């Protein structure tokens, strides 16, 4: 059995509903629904969730660990939430959050407007910082990657959009 799949999930203030083939996690920040793979059994035991593979196959074993990680992220998302911080490095690079849109000035001849998907919010504490928040870890990471993709850090000066914890290794310029 998967080492990850063995450990139980603590439901820290979240409600869980197990329907046929899906799991719904409800917490103070919102609700997330996810389909459960039929090769995985989910059991709710007094504030903890236990997952186990249906049989001893390698696939069921692997999927039990994967489903456990996904459900644990759902519980964390509806109780604490997820956030991803981005920084803009470069002269004139600016960001501004307006409702469900993120306006970016990234050195192009036109401003870049990124539409936020449902359930994801963007904040700009300063003009060169972006904080993307939401309850779905996958969506938060996807939106952060899309915003970074508009102008990834270039290897010579490091200009561009980068994750706050990202280390950009700079190349040396060509010498004669």
From Swiss-Prot:
InterPro entries the record matches: Ribosomal_uL6-like, Ribosomal_uL6-like_a/b-dom_sf, Ribosomal_uL6_a/b-dom, Ribosomal_uL6_bac-type, Ribosomal_uL6_CS
Keywords: Ribonucleoprotein, Ribosomal protein, RNA-binding, rRNA-binding
Short name of any one Pfam family annotated for the protein: Ribosomal_L6
Quaternary data: Part of the 50S ribosomal subunit.
UniProt function note: This protein binds to the 23S rRNA, and is important in its secondary structure. It is located near the subunit interface in the base of the L7/L12 stalk, and near the tRNA binding site of the peptidyltransferase center.
Keyword Nucleus: no
Family from the record: Belongs to the universal ribosomal protein uL6 family.
UniProt keyword annotation of rRNA-binding present: yes
Gene: rplF
GO cellular component, one term: cytosolic large ribosomal subunit
Protein name (record): Large ribosomal subunit protein uL6
Entry GO MF terms: rRNA binding; structural constituent of ribosome
Listed SUPFAM superfamilies: Ribosomal protein L6
GO biological process: cytoplasmic translation
């Amino acid at each position: 059995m998967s080492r990850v799949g063995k450990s139980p999930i603590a439901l820290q203030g979240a409600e869980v509903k197990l329907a046929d083939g899906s799991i719904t996690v409800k917490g103070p920040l919102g609700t997330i629904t996810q389909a459960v793979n039929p090769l995985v059994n989910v059991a709710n035991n007094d504030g903890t969730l236990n997952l186990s593979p249906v049989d001893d196959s390698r696939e069921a074993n692997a999927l039990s660990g994967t489903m456990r990680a996904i459900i644990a992220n759902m519980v964390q998302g509806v109780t604490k939430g997820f956030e991803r911080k981005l920084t803009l490095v470069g002269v004139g690079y600016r960001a501004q959050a307006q409702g469900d849109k993120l306006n970016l000035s990234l050195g192009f001849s036109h401003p870049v407007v990124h539409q936020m998907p449902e359930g994801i919010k963007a904040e700009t504490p300063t003009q060169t910082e972006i904080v993307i928040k939401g309850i779905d870890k996958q969506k938060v990471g996807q939106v952060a990657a899309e915003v970074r993709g508009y102008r990834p850090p270039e290897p010579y000066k490091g200009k561009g959009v980068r994750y706050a914890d990202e280390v950009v290794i700079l190349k040396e310029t060509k010498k004669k």
